[in-house]
Amino acid sequence: MGKAAAVGTAVVVAAAVGVAVVLARRRRRRDLELVEGAAAERKRKVAAVIEDVEHALSTPTALLRGISDAMVTEMERGLRGDSHAMVKMLITYVDNLPTGNEQGLFYALDLGGTNFRVLRVQLGGKEKRVVQQQYEEVSIPPHLMVGTSMELFDFIASALSKFVDTEGDDFHLPEGRQRELGFTFSFPVSQTSISSGTLIKWTKGFSINDAVGEDVVSELGKAMERQGLDMKIAALVNDTVGTLAGGRYADNSVVAAIILGTGTNAAYVENANAIPKWTGLLPRSGNMVINTEWGSFKSDKLPLSEFDKAMDFESLNPGEQIYEKLISGMYLGEIVRRILLKLAHDAALFGDVVPSKLEQPFVLRTPDMSAMHHDSSHDLKTVGAKLKDIVGVPDTSLEVRYITSHICDIVAERAARLAAAGIYGVLKKLGRDKMPKDGSKMPRTVIALDGGLYEHYKKFSSCLESTLTDLLGDDVSSSVVTKLANDGSGIGAALLAASHSQYAEID
């Protein structure tokens, strides 16, 4: 009886174990199904967000043509002097661009941020061109960026004076002549001549109240006098106009310059007769360089997504510089961050917890975006490293890395195509967008481009160029060239000092 009971107990235990094993297997299978279901749901949500992003940021060619037309309309409003024009089309008073014949010693001062550059160039005319050039970069102490006008310009003039003192035998100023300077000043000014301009407001971290409303040429001139420096400021220009001048000196077919860097702008050569707001005698050259300030362009045709609208709303200048916020290096990385944040919140892209670093505005910079976008390794190693360092996610799957790279591609492509639409608009304004009606040969047309975004973000620049070719068509695009004018604004200012020299007619 005892043996039978023991056997019975063993059978019951074995049965219980068997049931437990079966139940455990079922539970594991159910848990696995739940995990697989959750993963499938996450993938579905990720795909849905990406589909919405692709749609919101899409730029079909027909839309780009409409944007170009809207750009031309705004340019014409600006040239008429319409007070409500979004694209201001500022008259620069630069009516003579360098020809290559310029000779002599000229200086340039390039002030546009926390550093400034002083440069000198010896020009040798058509044959020798740039004989010699030297430059020096100087950091501006932070306290001078918020001090007084006199303190800032005295510091700049002192550095310029020291630079002049190092002028060697390679540089020659003809007897009895005054040194001349081109002043690149990349802040908003209201110009009344080639060598005068009133500061409208400071940007880029400067806040010097007593300089606002003052003529910056006069302020610099007085500072140079205090240093005992005998130098005439022959030209006041912004960086885009300087790039145009440098581009024209290198290639006589350059008609426009585009800056695509932290910010964006365009300048081009307009027929003076096509500027209704121009008053007084027309320039002898018949031309006038226009500083478009196209970053402020906006139109209901621009594809603004929820990410763009939120970024604009939270910016220091809501409702302003809309075009710039869509295409310039200051903002592209931030747009990518906002899209990744939505994927993290709505689709758990980085897991159940949203990375806290991803919540920080502008933590993802455009150079980091570019590095991820250009990662061609089989495991997208650079993307993984950037997500670890910037977003704080130590281990990311290949799928997450691919999605991140794809978001970079979407944002960069939209920016490049919108930039191409703007360039196409400038070409339309110049009548360089179609073959001549009389059947003559299309003139060679060169666009000088500068800025870190265009120079270093290769997928951006190649997309811009292919989009411009698409907009122009094969016949016209074969005569239109985009050319990198690396660091053209500094030497461009010196060249404009030469072309607007008080001794130009004597030479």
From Swiss-Prot:
UniProt cross-references to PROSITE patterns, sorted A to Z: HEXOKINASE_1, HEXOKINASE_2
Catalytic activity from the UniProt record: a D-hexose + ATP = a D-hexose 6-phosphate + ADP + H(+); D-fructose + ATP = D-fructose 6-phosphate + ADP + H(+); D-glucose + ATP = D-glucose 6-phosphate + ADP + H(+)
Hexokinase domain ranges (all copies): 44-498
CDD domains hit by this protein: ASKHA_NBD_HK_plant
Topology versus the membrane: Single-pass membrane protein
Annotated keywords: ATP-binding, Chloroplast, Glycolysis, Kinase, Membrane, Nucleotide-binding, Plastid, Plastid outer membrane, Transferase, Transmembrane, Transmembrane helix
Recorded phenotype for the gene knockout or disruption: Male sterility of pollen grains due to impaired synthesis and utilization of starch in pollen grains.
GO cellular component assignments: chloroplast outer membrane; cytosol; mitochondrion
Transmembrane residue ranges: 4-24
Tissue: Expressed in roots, leaves, flowers, immature seeds, endosperm and seed coat.
Family annotation (InterPro entries): ATPase_NBD, Hexokinase, Hexokinase_BS, Hexokinase_C, Hexokinase_N
Family (UniProt): Belongs to the hexokinase family.
Name the UniProt record assigns to this protein: Hexokinase-5
Taxonomic lineage: Eukaryota, Viridiplantae, Streptophyta, Embryophyta, Tracheophyta
